[in-house]
């Protein structure tokens, strides 16, 4: 990107909440540097990204689109900033899942849209990941129904329905939604969309499960991965049922926290049926 230069400490780190810079922060820093130092931004980006002036002109003032183009061209596979990972680049799946569980969280598998070669063997992949500690599956439904091309939409909707059915078969609750990692993403998914009708119940059940686990872990340390949960629910399916029930009972916000904390501190020895009964009594 010569002659544009950025300084990591000066230009990138101030964009982060806690010094945890990602490639997106670097893209924003470069875009800002170009605005400060280049008189013809369109010409600059057209040359560096190997695009036409018209294409750059059409997105230059659209933050998410120009950011995504810069990131995809320079930082993804084939780009000058891409480094091919090796087996030593990242910790193992088992190590990551152990850390996640130790934090009281839920190790999740991820699913894109069902069209890649790997996701065509999704059952085999999920069974492998379950063996490594995964207990839930993350889905971004917008990718599979909010699509302009009718044929692509039809194909991806079928893949969505298939993965939800497979998750049910494998006792994997769903963590559904769009991560807030880029401007323009949905804040809340439209579960009322007709296309999501066949999977809405599974999504809502899973939302109750995620909330039930989160609330009980935060207030009592009795989340899905706790020793208490494993002692009382030897199977993932039984744990799923309990935390889904709890999630439907516990009110949101401070009221839910207060109701949970009213349960005896000795609740590590409490029968789950007693926990649910006490939660219901507090309604």
Label for each model-derived stretch:
Residues 1-48, 252:
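Non-catalytic, alpha-helical, charged scaffold/linker segments
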Residues 42-46, 51-57, 70, 81-87:
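Short catalytic-site patches enriched in acidic/histidine residues
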Residues 61-73, 79-283:
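Charged catalytic cores and adjacent phosphate/nucleic-acid-binding surfaces used
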């Amino acid at each position: 990107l010569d002659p544009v230069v950025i300084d990591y400490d000066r230009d990138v780190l101030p964009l982060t909440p806690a010094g945890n810079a990602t490639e997106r922060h670097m893209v924003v820093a470069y875009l800002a540097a170009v605005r400060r130092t280049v008189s013809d931004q369109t010409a600059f980006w057209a040359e560096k990204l190997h695009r036409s002036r018209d294409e750059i002109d059409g997105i230059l003032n659209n933050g998410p689109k120009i950011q995504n183009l810069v990131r995809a061209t320079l930082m993804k596979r084939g780009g000058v900033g891409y480094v091919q990972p090796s087996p030593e680049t990242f910790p193992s799946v088992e190590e990551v899942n152990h850390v996640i569980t130790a934090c009281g969280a839920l190790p999740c598998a991820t699913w894109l849209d069902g069209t890649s070669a790997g996701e065509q063997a999704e059952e085999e992949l999920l069974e492998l990941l379950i063996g490594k500690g995964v207990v839930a599956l993350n889905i971004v439904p917008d990718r599979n129904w909010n699509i302009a091309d009718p044929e692509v939409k039809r194909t991806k909707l079928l893949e969505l329905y298939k993965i939800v059915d497979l998750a049910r078969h494998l006792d994997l609750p769903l963590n559904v939604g769009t991560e807030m990692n880029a401007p323009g993403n949905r804040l809340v998914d439209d579960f009322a969309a007709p296309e999501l009708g066949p999977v809405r119940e599974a999504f809502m059940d899973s939302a109750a499960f995620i909330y039930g686990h989160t609330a009980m872990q935060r207030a009592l340390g009795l989340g899905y991965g706790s020793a208490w949960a494993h002692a009382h629910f030897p199977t993932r399916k039984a744990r799923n049922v309990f935390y889904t029930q709890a999630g439907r009972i516990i009110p949101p916000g401070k009221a839910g926290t207060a109701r949970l904390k009213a349960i005896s501190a000795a609740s590590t020895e409490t029968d789950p049926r007693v926990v649910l009964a006490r939660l219901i009594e507090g309604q």
